[in-house]
């Protein structure tokens, strides 16, 4: 087995080698889309942890039973008989 020594070749790159690493428009769009998805995922994870830590703060003060009672009393004018 022969081993080769890789020195600091990044300092010796020519202009053609540097342009070979440039991204196309499709790659830039893909990376931007993945970045936006990662940010969205991070926000969802933070929101889920907030709900897990304090689940009752996000609930409204009225309950479904209160709304059903009002519906049975006929307080909604748009209800069809």
Swiss-Prot record:
Domain of life per record: Eukaryota
Location relative to the cell: Membrane
Gene: CTXN2
Gene Ontology CC annotation, any one: membrane
Record organism: Homo sapiens
Keyword Membrane: yes
Name of the molecule in the record: Cortexin-2
Membrane topology: Single-pass membrane protein
Keywords of the record: Membrane, Transmembrane, Transmembrane helix
Transmembrane segments: 29-49
S-adenosyl-L-methionine as UniProt keyword: no
Family per record: Belongs to the cortexin family.
InterPro entries reported for this sequence: Cortexin (IPR020066)
């Amino acid at each position: 087995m022969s081993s080769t020594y890789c020195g600091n070749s990044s300092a010796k790159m020519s202009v053609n080698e540097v342009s070979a690493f440039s991204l196309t428009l499709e790659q830039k769009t893909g990376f931007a889309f993945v970045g936006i998805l990662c940010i969205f995922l991070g926000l969802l994870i933070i929101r889920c942890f907030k709900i897990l830590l304090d689940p009752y703060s996000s609930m409204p003060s009225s309950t479904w039973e209160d709304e059903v009672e009002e519906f049975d009393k006929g307080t909604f004018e748009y209800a069809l008989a």
